[in-house]
Amino acid sequence: MTGLLRKPIAHFIRGTCGSTYKLSYAVCGFVLEIDIKLVSNQEFGTMVWDAALGLCQYFEEQKLSFSQKKVIELGAGTGILSILSLLLGGDVTITDKPQLLKQIELNVFANTPSSCRARVTIRALSWGFDHTFFPSDYDYILCADIMYTLASVPLILKTLLHLSNERTVIYFASTMSICRKLISSGYETLSQHFNCDLVYRYENKDVNLYRLTKRT
């Protein structure tokens, strides 16, 4: 299926010493206010990527619920996708580099009621290195725009193989224009171990959404 990634309700709300601003996104009946860093050397984790917005919109269009489901996100960045999954009922583990966890925590606390917070864990995860400290019983794994270097692909694969089981559904979204050849090659690698189905494409932003399940 194909469609258009709609323009989010996103506007400047405030600035803090010129280094951060807040954007507002309406999705699934919630308004998420996400702090964005303007100046950072961790650029991959300090903006809301189109692939994450694509998955948010897909969850809304499909009326997905994560109630009583274990969810983990790899490379969560600002945390918007994990926050939505938490609000949709999931028991959510949010992971990224250690230096990004504080910003994720701030966004989680700004967008979720206290009643949700017993269901969220925020942890560092280095793909391919400390993934074995996490369980292998997740119902859903979320990945949005995390294939951006050739070296990352085998590390992502190793991590996904550990975290998943035969019942796990992996939603993997990519903005293909970031590096079409690299990303296409990455999906070919993943497809050797996972059934990899293109479930949606947002033509206007060149975002592909895939549903992966482990080959048996």
Question: Where is each model-derived feature located?
Answer:
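S-adenosylmethionine-dependent methyltransferases
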Residues: 1-216
